[in-house]
């Protein structure tokens, strides 16, 4: 297929596909957990989505049942047997890990006591891809002209789709964006950000950042010391503190 432009919008497969043409896409899937309760007789069908940030939980009504999911600070990378997303895994499920989810489920039962009386109809574990800073990956890739990335939505892809599509289309048509969206521009990353040792450790932290406090200039704690300045050791001896640039 010959074309003038290509948009890579293949979700958690994007990193693997782009690697075949030496393009770096820094994202990787984590395991994402939720449960669906048995029917709860007195649940309000108009119940809004509840978010308990202190306990990393979201809860929403689902056809008379309650769906409870978690964005935990100690996430698990998916597909760790070979660190490759299977080509045919669309809408697939990962093995259950109730021990990992149980502490958050207990907190959910404390928040919504009726949940503890209803039972669990479905325990779900599926892959969801995340980026090194929990921001999108948009724009033309530095390695290949006219190859645009549209992905890395960190579990909020549905709500982001309209705006991301609009930005991508305008970027392709005009060659640039009038607004300052550098925090979403894929060019903010370097090649090493997509290497397995970096990205698989970093996404254990970034999933939880969805429900963490977004302090200004917050520093990540994972995947540090990947690239150091020449006088790093000298500064350590002088008592310096370091941050990610």
Over which residues does each language-model region extend?
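Central helical "cap/lid" subdomain
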Residues: 3-46
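Mid-domain catalytic core of redox enzymes
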Residues: 19-21, 35-77, 96-99
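A short alpha-helix-loop-beta-strand transition element characteristic
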Residues: 24-27, 51, 117, 178-180, ...
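Long, low-complexity segments enriched in small/aliphatic residues
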Residues: 222-245
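C-terminal catalytic lobe of FAD-dependent flavoproteins
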Residues: 46, 54, 63, 77, ...
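Helical element adjacent to the flavin cofactor pocket in flavoenzyme catalytic cores
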Residues: 1-5, 9, 162, 170
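Pocket-edge structural micro-motifs
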Residues: 38-39, 61, 68-72, 122, ...
């Amino acid at each position: 297929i010959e074309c003038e432009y290509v948009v890579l919008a293949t979700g958690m497969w994007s990193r693997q596909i782009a690697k075949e043409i030496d393009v770096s896409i820094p994202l990787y899937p984590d395991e994402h957990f939720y449960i669906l309760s048995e029917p709860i007789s007195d649940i309000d069908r108009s119940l809004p989505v509840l978010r308990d940030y202190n306990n990393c939980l979201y809860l929403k009504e689902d056809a008379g049942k309650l769906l409870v999911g978690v964005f935990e600070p100690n996430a698990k990378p998916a597909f760790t047997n070979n660190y490759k997303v299977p080509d045919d895994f669309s809408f697939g499920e990962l093995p259950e890990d109730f021990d990992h989810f149980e502490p958050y489920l207990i907190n959910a039962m404390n928040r919504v006591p009726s949940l503890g009386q209803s039972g669990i109809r479905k325990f779900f574990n599926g892959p969801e891809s995340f980026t090194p800073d929990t921001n999108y990956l948009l724009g033309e890739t530095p390695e290949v002209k006219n190859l645009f990335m549209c992905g890395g939505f960190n579990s909020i892809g549905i709500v982001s789709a309209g705006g991301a599509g609009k930005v991508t289309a305008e970027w392709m048509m005009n060659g640039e964006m009038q607004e300052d969206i550098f925090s979403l521009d894929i060019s903010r990353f370097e090649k090493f950000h997509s290497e397995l040792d970096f990205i698989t450790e970093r996404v254990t932290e970034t999933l939880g950042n969805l429900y963490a406090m977004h302090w200004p200039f917050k520093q990540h704690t994972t995947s540090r010391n990947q690239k150091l300045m020449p006088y790093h050791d000298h500064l350590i001896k002088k008592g310096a503190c370091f941050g990610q640039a």
